[in-house]
Amino acid sequence: MPRSSRQQAGREAEAFALQFLQRQGLHLIEQNWLCKRGELDLVMLDGDTVVFVEVRYRRHSGWGGATESVDFRKQAKLVTAAQLFLQQATDWASHPCRFDVIAIEGQPGNAAPLNWIKSAFDS
């Protein structure tokens, strides 16, 4: 799949995940927050908890599923990016935090199975 098609599929998966989370009552703080250490796909608020959401999309699981792609190295990058986010967005620094993963396999929005893993890993 060409890079632009993969990027489009990734954007669609993020939009699908965002809509799902908003229907669950979460509120968007930031989307695609970039820093020198990486990117945070979605930063949401669930009650009083700041939730850093990694959205992983795989069209099929031939090379490993979406969930398995959030390995230890990726987790460490997300934790570092979240720390930098909280240093800059000081209003949220005193809130409890958690790391969730949204794993989507198939075509986003076309009855693709969405797996929401709350507290997928610890910092």
UniProtKB/Swiss-Prot annotation:
Q: Which GO terms describe its molecular function?
A: nucleic acid binding
What CDD domains would the database entry show?
PoNe_Nuclease
Origin: domain of life: Bacteria
Q: Which InterPro entries match?
A: Restrct_endonuc-II-like, tRNA_endonuc-like_dom_sf, UPF0102_YraN-like
Q: Which family does it belong to?
A: Belongs to the UPF0102 family.
For this entry, the protein name equals UPF0102 protein PSPPH_4120
Q: Which organism is it from?
A: Pseudomonas savastanoi pv. phaseolicola (strain 1448A / Race 6)
